[in-house]
């Protein structure tokens, strides 16, 4: 799997609400020998700790996955809810 960083967003610390963190929005590519299949990976880096989650096999259409990734980035969707948002967007 190839993971390519497309967007990165910095969040500041807000006392009792949010930790300082960096969120990376990435496209994943898997070549199964016949075609390329794309997914989305989001990673959050907080003080030397990194969490990441991936939704694989979203589509073979790069532009569709790229548009979903842009939506997640522009709306600051984080690692907790991005899987549900992707599912909703694919079902529209």
Protein language model features and the residues they cover:
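A generic structural micro-environment signature
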Residues: 7, 33, 61-64
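A short, structured beta-strand/loop element
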Residues: 32-54
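Short amphipathic beta-strand and strand-loop transition segments with alternating hydrophobic
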Residues: 24-31
């Amino acid at each position: 799997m190839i993971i390519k960083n497309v967007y990165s967003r910095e969040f500041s610390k807000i006392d009792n609400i949010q930790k300082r963190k960096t969120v990376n929005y990435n496209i994943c590519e898997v070549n199964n020998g016949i075609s390329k299949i794309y997914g989305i990976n989001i990673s959050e880096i907080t003080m030397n700790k990194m969490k990441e989650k991936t939704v694989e096999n979203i589509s073979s259409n790069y532009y569709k996955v790229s548009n979903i990734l842009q939506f997640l980035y522009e709306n600051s969707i984080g690692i907790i809810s991005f899987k549900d948002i992707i599912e909703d967007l694919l079902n529209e």
